Each structure stands twice: as C-alpha cells, then as structure tokens.
Amino acid sequence: MMVATDRVSAFDRKLGIEIPDKGKILTAISAEFAKLADNWGRATAYFYADAPCPDEVNDFSLYQFDSYRVIRDAPELAGRFTFMANLRMFPVECIVRGYLFGSLWKLYEQGERKFCGIELPDGLVKGSKLPQPIFTPTTKAPEGEHDENITIGKMVDILNKAGLNGERWTDKVRMAMDIREFCVGLYQKACTYADGLIIADTKFELGLNSDGLILFGDEILTPDSSRFWDAETYVPGEEPKSYDKQIIRDYLAEAKARGEVNPTLPAEIIETTRERYIELYERLFGKIWPRE
C-alpha cells in the first residue's frame, strides 16, 4: 500500500511543513495517469477501482479482510492510499527531460554539454525545449544527500549488482534500454495528452513484478515528481508559470540567498502551492476538485 501525505520536501530534505490536501491531490493525479498509462501500453503496479481485478488481489482475497475495510474506511487515509503490486524496485531514479531546467540548466550554464552520455548543442537558454527528450538516470542517494547523474553504462553496472535476476533479464543492457524506452515513451504520451500544459521533466520509479515484467511504481506524473508549465505563457529564457513544487523551491532559494537558515514557508506560499496543484488536476483531467 502506498500512502501520500501532505508533507513537503525540497532540495533532498524534509521541511516539516504540510500543504493541505496535497496527498489527496497527488493520489488522484497518479491514479488518473496510471489508468492512462495502462491504456497507452505502459503497465503500472496500480490497482484501481474500475480495473480488472489482478491475480495478486484475487489470490490474496484482499477485499475479504477486516484490515482492508479498516484501511479503506479510516478517515485519515481517505483519498490518500493506493494498493499496488509488490515490485522489486530498480535502485535508480529514471528521469526524462524535455526542457533545459533545474539542475540540468545549472550545469549547462557552467559550460557542461554532455549529460548522462548525451551531448546538448550550444546556444540554449534556461527553459529551452531540447531537440528531443533525454533520459538522465540518477542514483538513489540516502536521505539528505544528492542523487548523482549516471550514464546508461553506470546504470547497467548498478542493475547487475542489484541481483535482479531471472530468465527474462540475464541481459542487463537490454533491461536498461527497455527501462529508457518505457520512460521516454510514457513521457511523450503524457506530453501529447496534457493539452495547454508543458511537462518539462519528470521522474519515474520502476521495478519487476513476480513474473519479471517491468512496471511503473510509486507516483506517476505528479507535481511532486514533475515540472508542469503553462504552455500559453511559456517563453524560453523567462521563468514559466509552474504548477508544481517550483514555487517552494524558488522561495527557499531566495531565503537562502538572504542568509536564512532552515526557513519556513509563509501562509501565502502554502496556499498558492495548494491552488496550483488543484488547478493542475482540473486542467489535466477536466474534473472539479472539491474545495472546502
């Protein structure tokens, strides 16, 4: 079971702050994209209400257990939890980037042009659309430490050491290539779907199920794991209107520049972030979020 809370993290640290309803919004967005991903031929580990009942659920008789009913009816978990197939997760984070932003832009600005084995051209500006989406995997660093960009070759080494064996995946180079294809493919499908919005980049996490199939796990295309921009106001080189955690990142970066240590988020930043998350959900799926 995966539970999404209202807690906030940024720059690889937990802030001890909550955004009201954030966990529910993330759960709803992930569930909607899980359904879309399955329709697009990108299988996920999600069990959702109107999906055919998976064998894992039938075998487990999940819905007959009192503990399930307790979880389902617990008010503190309402709208925040998702049942998922058990996966052996890959020890890498799978990032797809369609635009030059964030840590990639910082390195590019410093003169770097090769990222995870991929060469980018000169002359790009912050927020430029890349010639094509690029796959930039990273390590999974311990909490408080920064993830490290890695090449596909390094990713293969990590997969070899992870013990993810079986008849299907004796060739870890093929596994890495398939992971890349799955991630870039889902990103491209989502970009086409998200009319009026730009998905600048996103982070996926994947794993193997009991049959050795690669499935998407964890959150999928949420504003916590992705950057969403308003397409109408997007101008390369300018700060885009974002519907994600960038509002929080920008405030914390400004606070750090002012010399503040462990700054807190003011009420207006918290409320703006909540409203942007809600607006994103409504724009993506054409549904109204119940505001209280």
Give the role of each language-model region.
Residues M1-A141, A257, V261-E292:
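Active-site loop/lid in soluble adenylation, ligation, and acyl-transfer enzymes
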Residues R13-I25, A141-R180, P263-P266:
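Short histidine-centered catalytic/ligand-binding loop motif
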Residues A28, R174, D178-E181, Y243, ...:
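Generic recognition of stable, solvent-exposed alpha-helical segments in well-folded globular domains
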Residues T44-A51, T192-L208:
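A short glycine-rich, hydrophobically flanked beta-strand micro-motif that places a catalytic Asp/Glu
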Residues M89-P91, G196-I199, S210-I214:
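Coil-to-beta-strand transition motifs
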Residues E167-A200:
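A long amphipathic alpha-helix within ATP-dependent nucleotide-binding catalytic cores
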Residues F204-Q246:
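Catalytic activation segment of kinase domains across protein kinase-like and atypical kinase folds
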Residues K241-T264:
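A hydrophobic, small-residue-rich beta->alpha segment in the mid-to-C-terminal subdomain
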